[in-house]
Amino acid sequence: MKVLLVRLIKGYKIFISPILPPSCRFQPTCSEYAMEAIERFGIFKGTAMAVMRILRCHPFHPGGYDPVPPKK
């Protein structure tokens, strides 16, 4: 299941993201963050972290460098 989610995100990056204007306010981008969070923390926690990150990615948030935290 983890592999499927990561492949879906990679598909988004290859096929959909180039069509849309750049809009992510963070480094790494939200899709890169989601892939890394899912790979590092698993499906449930990684997806929850990615959703929270995407909810913060809006014009009123300053953005900036926000890496996936290390696993404890």
UniProtKB/Swiss-Prot annotation:
Recorded GO CC terms: plasma membrane
Pfam families per the UniProt record, alphabetical: YidD (PF01809)
Record key words, sorted: Cell inner membrane, Cell membrane, Membrane
Principal cellular location given in the protein's record: membrane
Membrane-protein topology: Peripheral membrane protein
Subcellular location: Cell inner membrane
Function: Could be involved in insertion of integral membrane proteins into the membrane.
Family in the record: Belongs to the UPF0161 family.
NCBIfam families (alphabetical): membrane protein insertion efficiency factor YidD (TIGR00278)
Name this polypeptide is given: Putative membrane protein insertion efficiency factor
